Amino acid sequence: MTHKKQKKEMSDSEKKTFNEDSKHSILAVDLVRLILERLSFVDFHRARCVSSIWYIASKTVIGVTNPTTPWLILFPKGDVEIKKDSCKLYDPHENKTYIVRDLGFDLVTSRCLASSGSWFLMLDHRTEFHLLNLFTRVRIPLPSLESTRGSDIKIGNAVLWVDEQRKDYLVVWNISSLFGYHKKGDDRWKVFKPLENERCIIAMVFKENKLYVLSVDGNVDVFYFSGNDSPVRCATLPSSPLRKGHKVVVTLSGEVLIIVAKVEPYPRTRLCFFAVYKMDPKSSRWETIKSLAGEALILDLGITVEAKVMKNCIYFSNDQFHRYNENSLWNVSNKSGVFVYHFRSANVVQLVELLTASSRTSKILFKDARCFFPTFTSKWLL
């Protein structure tokens, strides 16, 4: 009888201790939430990784979502002698810049091929691929290309698709009309060559399990990726008469656009113009359109996004424009600038100011600005 009573008293004591610990945990979450609500977007997502309590508290903060305006990333220039493992991020919504330091590898000798959310597809020393998340600093090595085709390789285009909820990813690249792809879990690159009679590929974009391929012949071929099966060609759009300086884009509704970029021949102005073409379903011809239906076009990603303020605009960089059109816009000092092209303002290109040069606090010079949409829905893909 005494033993049972003592056992009951011990249980009551343990219950009291548990209740006190629960109150302290709730109090800690409330205090952390107050701190998180005062932080900027980047600091908020840094702080949520401090501990499990901070992560739990972050889920209760209302109004913090992934950005709907594209951010910009700039990589260090090739002539930099120090800090080659750092890059700069720019948030246009808050007009703030952030330098991500000590990533652990040389970004100067690496080449960024594509991005998906906060993940970047990097190619190092021409044959070594890896995925990099700048915020979590997770780096995922991919199979080397040396076993595929040797060291003399020049990647034409590449796309990256990442599903952070399912922890899945897909990488596709091309060399002329040869395609290579790698899915999570594969131990090597798989190769296919579906365009035997066509020349090199100009541009690619991946959306909703479909790879849209624009060839120099003006054809747009669509390939469907499903599970472990090989990609299957599911559509071919009529050939476009356009031959130079263009890119394929997929809109929010799934429509395919072809973008043609041109530079005014006057060296003092160096203004550019964009023509946007969409397939007319009745005539099966590519027709010019004058509006993006209130959406914004991200040339780097090959997609359109919903726009609340900067509607009917094209986001692009001078480095990117040179890659696609073999022409630069303004003078050399502005070659790393990022621009916004407005359809409704007499085809005027407006410069988005960036600190591409070094500052008092940083001696790093940056170049090659790219647009991306940061996401913080998951910690890693491994």
Curated annotation (Swiss-Prot):
Q: Which Pfam families match?
A: Beta-prop_KIB1-4, F-box
SUPFAM superfamilies in the record, alphabetically?
A: Galactose oxidase, central domain
Repeat (Kelch) positions are: 73-117, 159-209, 259-306
The alphabetized UniProt keywords are: Brassinosteroid signaling pathway, Cytoplasm, Kelch repeat, Nucleus, Repeat, Ubl conjugation pathway
Identify the domain of life. Eukaryota
Q: Which InterPro entries match?
A: F-box_BR-signaling, F-box_dom, Gal_Oxase/kelch_b-propeller, KIB1-4_b-propeller
State which tissues express it. Expressed in seedlings, leaves, stems, flower buds and flowers.
Self-association state and partner proteins as the record states: Part of a SCF (SKP1-cullin-F-box) protein ligase complex. Binds directly to several GSK3 family proteins such as SKP1A/ASK1, ASK1/SK11, ASK3/SK12, ASK5/SK13, ASK7/BIN2/SK21, ASK9/SK22 and ASK6/SK23. Interacts with ASK7/BIN2/SK21 in a brassinosteroid (BR)-dependent manner.
ATP-binding found in the keyword field: no
Protein name in UniProt: F-box/kelch-repeat protein KIB1
Q: Which GO biological process annotations does it have? A: brassinosteroid mediated signaling pathway; positive regulation of brassinosteroid mediated signaling pathway; protein ubiquitination; ubiquitin-dependent protein catabolic process
**Domain F-box positions:** 22-69
Single annotated GO MF: ubiquitin protein ligase activity
Known role: Component of SCF(ASK-cullin-F-box) E3 ubiquitin ligase complexes, which may mediate the ubiquitination and subsequent proteasomal degradation of target proteins. Required for brassinosteroid (BR) signal transduction. Mediates ASK7/BIN2/SK21 inactivation both by competing with substrate binding (e.g. BZR1) and by promoting its ubiquitination and subsequent proteasomal degradation.
Q: Per the record, what is one GO cellular component? A: cytoplasm
Query: How does gene deletion manifest?
Result: Abolished brassinosteroid (BR)-induced ASK7/BIN2/SK21 degradation, and severe BR-insensitivity. Suppression of the constitutive BR-response phenotype in the dominant mutant bzr1-1D, and accumulation of phosphorylated BZR1.
Where does it live in the cell? Answer: Cytoplasm; Nucleus, Nucleolus
